[in-house]
Each structure stands twice: as C-alpha cells, then as structure tokens.
Amino acid sequence: MSTVYDAKSLDEINVHFILCTERTGSSLLCLMLNLHPEIISPSEEPFALYLHSKYHRIVTWTDEDISSYVDDFFLLAEKNMDLYFTQRAIFHAELLANKNLLTYERIVKISYLNFYDSDQKNKSSVRVIVDKQIKYVYHLDKIQHLFPSAKFLLLVRDVRDNIVSKSIRKLNWNKHPFFLAAIWKGAYSRMLALPENNRLILKFEELIQSPESALKKACSFLSLEFSSNMLNTEGVFENYVDSQKEKLDPAFTEKLLAFHSGIRSPLDSKKIGQYKAFLSQRELQIIEGQCQYYLEIVNYELSNKKKTGIIRFSLYQFLAFLYRPFLLMIYLRIPLALKRKLKKRRNKRMSIPV
C-alpha cells in the first residue's frame, strides 16, 4: 500500500547536505547517519537539481506530469537504483496517491524518502534528509535557492591523504598529485565560502578516531539528539546488500563490496598520515604551499609554508577547473530533453533498459 503523506508533515522535514570530495569517508558518514531513526541519507543522485528546470513551475500535477517525472528520474539516475531505490511501480503509485498535495519541493522529498526499502529503513519517524552529492559543491548557489533553509556538513580529509587514497583507487581522469590537490582545493574553496553559521566542518580523522564526538557534533548541528545506534556499523552494509542480492548481478555485488571495503571493516586510523610513505618532499612542499590557506582553516599541521611550484601547479589547477566546475556547469545548462537523449544513447551502448 502506498504511503499517503500530509502536506504539513512533508513541509516539516528538513533537507540538509553533505559536501565533500571523493575518498573523504562520506559513505561511512552516510551509513552512520542512516542508523539514526530520524535521518535518511540517500544514495547520491542529483535529480533535485537536474529536474528542477522542467518541473518546478508545475502547480497542479497531473497523472501525465507524474509519469514524466518518474521516467526522467530513472533515466537520469547515476547510481544503481536496484540497490538503493524502491521499485519503480511502487514509487509511481506513491506519487499518484499524493498527487493533490504535490509541489516540486514535496515531490523531491517523497523521492528522497523512497531510497531504501521500508523494511530496511523505517521512514515514519524521519525528520531530516541529509543528501550527499559531490556535484552540488559546484552548484551551491542553485542548491541554496532550492533549499534556502539547508545546512551543510563539510566533510574534509587532509589533502595529502586524500591524494594517496584517490591514487590507490585510481579515481579521476588525471592521477597526478598536483591535479588531485587542485581538485581538493577547488572544492573546499567553494565550501568554506559558505556562512559559518550555516556549515559544520567534520574531519575524516575525527570520524575515524573519535566517531561519537564527531556524530554528536553533527546531530547537534542538525538539531537532533545523538543516537548511540549510529556507532553500530559492523555488518550493516553487508546485510543490506545481502537483502537486495536477488535484484543484483553477482559480479556487480562482488565489485560493490570490494569498493566499499572501508565501511565493512573496523574503523582504522592507520590510513591517517599514510601520505608520508607515498609523497616526496618536493611534492609535499608544493601541495602544502598551494593548499595552505584551506588546510590552516581546518587545522591541519603543515611541514612547510613556503609557496613554490606556482606555475606548475597553476597548470593542474586549470585542468582541474575544466574537469570539474566547467564540465558540470556545461552539463547543467544542457536542456533536459538533450540530457535524456544523451543518457538513452549511453544506456543503449551499455545495454541498460530505458
């Protein structure tokens, strides 16, 4: 049976965001947040931003509008919806059951609440949605316009360790440490420009070494009571994946568990400071010098404060700008109809049903 909401209850659910770059412990933080009975932290999907231009002006939603929204939602999805989202037919039926109260903000909230099956996450007590989306770092003005009451958890990891972790996982187009440092610098320069009363800095290192302290800060910032259940992460991810295994390809499941090995293992502080065995003194000197301002804001110790390699770093900084904010800006400006065509073509190449 579809959940029927009332407008007041939906409007009282707050939407907040985790901002970060890759390999900062965001999957662990989301796992912990989802163990709080009043929080849902969905799998990262940028639908709220990408569907806004087409649907935000609708005042009276029709069955056709809802069908179109569902089609676009699933077509533009970037992650594995079989794993994280309710069945398409159930989602569609729930939107139809709530048709008379829909606004764009409410349909977005209902969409968020359809992440994770109800037998895995009780939605009835959810008061706060915390969306983690790396892309939103580069669209903060639009996100603040969409959600003017949103607060932002800034999850930060020492740029030096972040570089090593990304290199090991072979993330990003360019693996050069200066390019990865420039990605970090570009992301946190945007995040740290947010008003201080509207953001909370959470450090990866504290989340690993003092998780209760970090989570208490996060809960207080979100105006919630801390739940000790948030610390009981052992086996949670494996059990969730196991509950969904009938929907998933075994090879995908194996890759997924391997990729998220970090949240399947006990918290390990050995990954803190691992850069000392990977980065050369010359690389450290340039990275610390170029990221110094932001490293000091978030209280990371530096071995060097001399700015060197400015010209060389500037080249990688320009490449990082093209790779992240510029490409994301271009994609956002592409009309939704063209986004649909591009995604259909991509799915066809990959033999994904559309």
Model-predicted regions and their roles:
Residues M1-F17, F115, Q120-K123, L192, ...:
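PAPS-dependent sulfotransferases, especially Golgi type II membrane carbohydrate sulfotransferases
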Residues I13-N14, T24, K135-Y138, G186, ...:
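Short, conserved clusters of charged catalytic residues that mark active-site
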Residues T21:
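P-loop (Walker A) phosphate-binding loop of NTP-binding proteins
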Residues S27-I39:
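A conserved segment at the C-terminal end of the G1
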Residues L35, S41, F47, D161, ...:
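Active-site micro-motifs of SAM-dependent methyltransferase domains
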Residues I40-S43, L200:
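Conserved catalytic segments around the Walker B and adjacent sensor/switch elements
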Residues P42-D131, Y136:
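PAPS-dependent sulfation machinery
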Residues D117-L231, V236-G262:
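PAPS-dependent sulfotransferase catalytic domain
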